[in-house]
Amino acid sequence: MEQAVYRPARKLCLAKHLMLATIGLASALGPAGFGMIVTASEVRAQAPLGTSYDPSALLDRARKKIGSTTRRLLKCTCLETIERSYYAPSEKVNANVMTENPTNSCDAKEFGGNGPLSLEVKDRLRLGVTVLGDKEIYSWAAASRFDSRSVFQIVSSGPIHMGSFGTYLPDIFENPGTRITFAGKKNEGSGEVFEYTFEVPAKASHYSVGTENAWRITGYHGSFQIYAATAELARLVEETEQLPPEAGMCRTRSRFDYHYMLIGDDEFLIPRESRVDTLSGTANETSSIITFSDCREYTAESSLRFEAEEPAATVKPGSQVPALLPAGLSLTLALSGSIDPATAAAGDAVSAKVSTAVRAPHSNQILVPAGAIAHGRILQMQHQYRSNRFLISIRFDTLEANGVVTPLSLQWDRELKAEKAITQVPLRSRGTEFSLPPPQTGETGGVFSLSATKAAYLPAGLKSKWITVNP
């Protein structure tokens, strides 16, 4: 039998952007075998006398199923969609005069218990996710290969969570330090479930909180439900202990509702929906709803590819398109397809057609022919509720012309205004506006801002003017 090696499971990482710190739940697959969590007698002791079921045996069956499916996640990749909501107190949370606690203190702060909240911002992300070795790896949904960077570098703002795909489960079910107690049984819509509570103390936890200079271990606790008939995990709920002040938040809590998804010829235990909430000392809260779709299984011929392996450009010998366009060229781009703020997400692919040929300065040489296609992705899809605006940040990074793909670095043309939008449904209010990119996009890219109405969208054919810059 292969020797079991227990690996660190989770990380919660600090990165101050937007309204709250970034969260990372980085998990490992853990050992190939299972160790006892609690003894059978300890679990049975919690069951009422006279019952015919065995909570310990059911738990053992469930653990084996969980371990099998988490290891098999190495063969799968899915699209992960994250919808994040940011809330702030409707009224200012003042310091406690009696205790002299500062307004950003975590003392007495509870989820939903600090007065009415106001929805400030919503955004949406779409990522590719798979498991490599003992961790989850990610890419933007539009990417042709996985990114060699961490998810915290890919998504530079807001709360982002690693582990929702399932790699965090070994830290609960394969951790010898986890204390599990049978809590009873109940009837759910899908049948009878057994409920257990668990606690992972800090001394046994692999859940760490990252600050700018160090990592801090935190304990956590929660409960889970197992279907009595099938020994399948139905739901898991957890909450961290109070986090250290340098974490930038007080606590996080998570809820995972599970189902088995048919991927290829096999079934895999994947969350139907996950919800991860954060609470800050200022009583701000965030809620992230995570779902998985378009899952597929790698075949024997498949292999993972990373961005670092991709050449910077695929330029054919003798091509008339230069390998790198000089700075200062003006391009008018027309969107190839519409972008609907109700469904679009950061990570989605976008493309636009070059409307007019671009010539070399002081020359008739055509550097970019009309009809060439600029490819890129959405970097931010945000709904700002106070201003009632949609903000859609886009960056184009490659240009395809005559079968040749070259790198492309663009920013808004600062001197020329965008041309009037071509639209079948007019944009309401102030219409479509254009601005420089947000800080996390760097110097390239731009932001479309439009009134947040039901009919609002960026239509196919929408033209905007850009200028080439040095990468």
Please provide the spans of the model-predicted regions.
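N-terminal secretory signal peptides that target proteins for export/translocation
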Residues: 1-15
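Sec-dependent N-terminal signal peptides
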Residues: 12-31
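Signal peptide processing junction and immediate N-terminal pro/mature segment
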Residues: 29-46
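Structured extracytoplasmic
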Residues: 43-220, 229-234, 240-254, 259-324, ...
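Hydrophobic beta-strand positions
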Residues: 185, 225-226, 398-399
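Active-site and channel-lining beta-strand-loop segments
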Residues: 221-228, 359-360
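Extended non-catalytic domains of envelope/secretory-pathway proteins
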Residues: 224-226, 238, 368
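Contiguous beta-sheet cores, especially beta-hairpins with glycine/small-residue-rich turns
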Residues: 234-236, 320-471
